[in-house]
Curated annotation (Swiss-Prot):
Entry similarity comment: Belongs to the WD repeat COPB2 family.
Species in which this protein is naturally found: Saccharomyces cerevisiae (strain ATCC 204508 / S288c) (Baker's yeast)
Database matches in SMART domains: WD40
Membrane topology: Peripheral membrane protein
Gene (name only): SEC27
Protein name: Coatomer subunit beta'
Length: 889
């Protein structure tokens, strides 16, 4: 049995005694020996909540998801309930006079069972204020485990160290029956088989054994041995045909529930194993186990169902909800099923029977006549209609050839064998020298080995090309020209896809000339076209279009190097295929609910022709057959992505897209016609920007006006000195509360009155007063502003400042006559041309003055000479005045 086991999350902590999964959230609950309870998100690996419950060990804990609770039982004899969203304690009561070992929650009723070292099991009702409904007595030692029967929740089983398992019914005080296990030591764990096909339960004991029981015949079906120490637990997996057991020897063992043989032994390095949980819905086959040094969450595979769809709509699958994994079912998709959008199809299901292996893959032959079931190292080929065995054998992997009469497989020795008409072709072989991991079907035989993919010719086994890629899947188009290789990253998750073109002619030419490298093949055989950076979970080719589902629950298609979304889903979906008869792709979820999504074949054909450079043919021959606005919109979006803007503009029925395309191609008038006055401001602004780029200023003004883009209008009006437009803009800006923009508009327009009124409106009285005085608004107007200024100062408690403010007579530009003269007269300010003339006049006047400078200077000196002489005779200030001296006679 192949199990893709991955460690999803592991955390070190104190000893984990109890563990449980939340049914819908990615949470795991752990109860610790230290008395703590921890809630972890195993997808983000972040602790959601931690609660210190008590100082004694907490041995049991469960989610009660429908109430948003967790319930725990501990060695202080108490049961506590917490709201896991808030951490608030809901209830706390003493449940037993001894340690509480196990807790079980009824799947539908408000009941909780608790098993204890006091030798009893008790039933509690949370809707009745956690009243004790019933006490079940009869065990002679510690009750280690209690479990409800999922097929009949009115009964439950209890496992005890007295080496018995008792089965009880709610409401009855005595057990229905007691199983004496025959195990040499006590029973640590008991669990029911979850599916309806087998009346089994399982027990784990300190005598190192695991026993499977038929509780109807009360007989032991099988005994499993292999652990080296006490077995702490053993459980049936809810979806896989396996049993998981854990022991104090530190290992987890995975057993085949059909053959009861060990398939895998795991040691995660966390010492002794104490507890187990399986995801209640089987999501990604999660299991979680608690150990001495922490806990781990493991994924035993993905959620992809095992199914196959043939070319005419016949579906075959194994397992499913409430069915064993080996059960095979079929249904026919007729294409006329009427369902609501996003609702599954109502299909008539028929059971074909069961197979002797655990089916790990189902595959129809290319024509749908045969179905292969592969699992447990075997393959069986059945006829699709009667489900009769056609061929069988041992294999590690199996793929169909290009026709329904040929196939290849990996045999027990690891060699590839080729069969034609159900007989081995002994003369056929492939030159492989390393271990083979997997085979891929298609136009060429794909072989995965050692991190490479090898492509071989089906006819003669010749190596066509070796490609260095760690492939998860290889998907070929129907015409054998295109191939999508789904790559995996280092974690084994889907990382990306590569679209390759197979050059068959180049390969045949090299083969004819004998130019094939033995280790690399033909270099020119494949060309890489595109890389698809998506997490691909499943995919199919429809023509040259690749349709696929993603890990983010999207249905997309990839064409021309671009990805387009078709639909979103709330859960993970897997692509079954495309039926041209219905124009639909079909998908299924993990429970094999089938969904259909309509897709236009004409749209795909149009895109295919366009990518081949035949766009004229696509427009002439295919486009007239395309119906519906959605299909035309998809084509227009595709053409836009391929930069066919003119063609997309002519085709698109979507007004928004046409507007965007009209801007791209410069058809501004068309873009204007597509808009209305009520259109979004963003579109008008985009039109305005495009108009500016093409110097269409008139259209730019109209667009910015409708967009209410005042800043852009200010740029335009000020650039063209449009005073009327600036005044209108200023008023609009003032109404919009954009006072700075409004003032600038008034200022550039020369509207001093408007600027003054705006300053007063915004209570900028000081600036308004100086503005009015400087630009000659009149003393009366200035005094009115000053009065308001003073009143505002007084109102704000600035009386001293108010007293110092003068009126118009103290401001620059005032006059005694009351008619203020402006210091700067905007109206009389000369224009640039007049200013140049004045400057020339000043130059001429300076030359005239310079020519007469000598005469002027001489005249000035004559006038200043006697004055200078007189001044020299006078003493300076502060100098002593000498006494007059008499002349000698």
């Amino acid at each position: 049995m192949k199990l893709d086991i991955k460690k999803t999350f592991s955390n070190r902590s104190d000893r984990v005694k109890g563990i449980d999964f939340h049914p819908t959230e990615p949470w795991v609950l752990t109860t610790l020996y230290s008395g703590r309870v921890e809630l972890w998100n195993y997808e983000t690996q972040v602790e959601v909540r931690s609660i210190q419950v008590t100082e004694t060990p907490v041995r049991a804990g469960k989610f009660i998801a429908r109430k948003n609770w967790i319930i725990v039982g501990s060695d202080d004899f108490r049961i506590r309930v917490f709201n896991y969203n808030t951490g608030e304690k809901v209830v706390d009561f003493e449940a037993h006079p001894d340690y509480i070992r196990s807790i079980a929650v009824h799947p539908t009723k408000p009941y909780v069972l608790s098993g204890s070292d006091d030798l009893t099991v008790k039933l509690w009702n949370w809707e009745n204020n956690w009243a004790l409904e019933q006490t079940f007595e009869g065990h002679e030692h510690f009750v280690m485990c209690v479990a409800f029967n999922p097929k009949d929740p009115s009964t439950f089983a209890s496992g005890c160290l007295d080496r018995t398992v008792k089965v009880w019914s709610l409401g009855q005080s005595t057990p229905n029956f007691t199983l004496t296990t025959g195990q040499e030591r006590g029973v640590n764990y008991v669990d029911y088989y979850p599916l309806p096909d087998k009346p089994y339960m399982i027990t784990a004991s300190d005598d190192l054994t695991i026993k499977i029981w038929d509780y109807q015949t009360k007989s032991c079906v099988a005994t499993l041995e292999g652990h080296m120490s006490n077995v702490s637990f053993a459980v049936f997996h809810p979806t896989l045909p396996i049993i998981i057991s854990g022991s104090e020897d530190g290992t987890l063992k995975i057993w085949n529930s059909s053959t009861y043989k060990v398939e895998k032994t795991l040691n995660v390095g966390l010492e002794r194993s104490w507890c187990i949980a399986t995801h209640p819905t089987g999501r990604k086959n999660y299991i979680a186990s608690g150990f001495d040094n922490g806990f781990t969450v493991l994924s035993l595979g993905n959620d992809e169902p095992t199914l196959s769809l043939d070319p005419v709509g016949k579906l075959v699958w194994s397992g499913g909800k409430n069915a064993a994994a080996s059960d095979i079912f079929t249904a026919v998709i007729r294409g006329n099923e009427e369902v609501e959008q996003d609702e599954p199809l109502s299909l008539q299901t028929k059971e074909l029977g069961s197979v002797d292996v655990f089916p790990q893959s189902l595959a129809h032959s290319p024509n749908g006549r045969f179905v292969t079931v592969v699992g447990d190292g075997e393959y069986v080929i059945y006829t699709a209609l009667a489900w009769r065995n056609k061929a069988f054998g041992k294999c590690q992997d199996f793929v169909w050839g290009p026709d329904s009469n040929s196939y290849a497989l990996i045999d027990e020795t690891g060699q590839i064998k080729y069969y034609k008409n159900f007989k081995e072709v002994t003369s056929w072989s492939v030159p492989m020298h390393s271990a083979i991991d997997r085979l891929f079907s298609g136009a060429l035989l794909g072989v995965k080995s050692d991190g490479f993919v090898y492509f071989f010719d089906w006819d003669n086994g010749t190596l066509v090309r070796r490609i260095d890629v760690n492939a998860k899947d290889v998907i070929w188009s129907d015409n054998g020209e295109l191939v999508m290789i789904v790559n995996t990253n280092s974690n084994g998750d889907e990382a990306s896809g590569y679209t390759l073109l197979f050059n068959k002619d180049a390969y045949l030419e090299a083969a004819n000339n004998g130019n094939i490298d033995d280790s690399e093949g033909v270099d020119e055989a494949f060309d890489v076209l595109y890389e698809l950076s998506e997490s691909i979970t499943s995919g199919k080719w429809v023509g040259d279009v690749f349709i696929f589902t993603t890990a983010t629950n999207r249905l997309n298609y990839f064409v021309g190097g671009k990805t387009y979304n078709l639909a979103h889903y709330t859960k993970e979906m897997y692509l079954l295929g495309y039926l041209a008869r219905d124009n639909k792709v079909y998908l299924a979820d993990r429970e094999v609910h089938v969904y259909g999504y309509e897709i236009s074949l004409e749209v795909l054909e149009f895109q295919t022709l366009t990518l081949r450079g035949e766009i004229e043919e696509a427009i002439e021959n295919v486009l007239p057959n395309v119906e519906g606005k959605d299909s035309l919109t998809k084509i227009a979006r595709f053409l836009e992505g391929q930069e066919y803007y003119e063609e997309a503009l002519n085709i698109s029925p979507d007004q928004d897209q046409k507007f965007e395309l009209a801007l791209k191609v410069g058809q501004l008038t068309l873009a204007r016609d597509l808009l209305t006055d009520e259109s979004a401001e963003m579109k008008w602004r985009a039109l305005g920007d495009a108009s500016l780029q093409r110097f269409n200023f008139k259209l730019a003004v109209e667009a910015f006006t409708n967009a209410h883009d005042l800043e852009s209008l200010f740029l335009l009006h000020s650039s063209f000195n449009n005073k009327e437009g600036l005044v209108t803009l200023a008023k609009d800006a003032e109404r919009a509360g954009k006072f700075n923009l409004a003032f600038n508009a008034y200022w550039i327009a020369g509207d001093i009155q408007g600027a003054k009124d705006l300053l007063i409106k915004s209570q900028r009285f000081s600036e308004a007063a100086f503005l009015g005085s400087t630009y000659g608004l009149g003393d009366d107007a200035v005094n009115d502003i000053v009065t308001k200024w003073k009143e505002n100062l007084i109102l704000n408690g600035k009386n001293t400042v108010s007293e110092r403010v003068c009126g118009a007579e103290g401001l620059p530009g005032s006059s005694s006559s009351g008619d203020a003269q402006p210091l700067i007269d905007l109206d009389s300010t000369p224009a640039p041309e007049q200013a140049d003339e004045n400057k020339e006049a000043e130059v001429e006047d300076s030359e005239f003055k310079e020519s007469n400078s000598e005469a002027v200077e001489a005249e000035k000196k004559e006038e200043e000479a006697p004055q200078q002489q007189q001044s020299e005779q006078q003493p300076e200030q502060g100098e002593a005045v000498p006494e007059p001296v008499e002349e000698e006679s």
